């Protein structure tokens, strides 16, 4: 899984993994949402089994994430709320 040490603002964020996996010839990414605590440093563990396959934001029925196919990662705010945000990321680890 992915372990994040961060300080948040109480909003929900999405961790995205890009992979070599394909769906109809196009690259599949895997998303997992996580909540933050306003103003508190804390650790978030996201098990690989918690990542959902997506293509351009649309949920797919498969395939399950294979950690050996991960090619990149990123962080998104995808809660559809306008306004400022404050997320401080201290570390990212795989476990």
Show where each model-derived region lies.
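Extracellular ligand-binding interfaces
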Residues: 1-59, 69, 83-88, 93-94
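Short beta-strand-plus-loop segments that form exposed binding edges in beta-rich domains
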Residues: 75-82
């Amino acid at each position: 899984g992915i372990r994040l040490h961060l300080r948040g603002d109480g909003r929900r964020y999405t961790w995205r993994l890009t992979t070599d996996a394909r769906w109809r010839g196009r690259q599949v990414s895997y998303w997992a949402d996580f909540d933050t605590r306003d103003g508190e440093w804390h650790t978030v563990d996201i098990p690989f089994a918690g990542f959902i396959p997506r293509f351009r934001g649309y949920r797919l029925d498969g395939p399950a994430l294979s950690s050996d196919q991960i090619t990149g990662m990123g962080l998104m705010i995808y809660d559809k709320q306008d306004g400022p945000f404050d997320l401080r990321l201290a570390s990212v680890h795989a476990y």
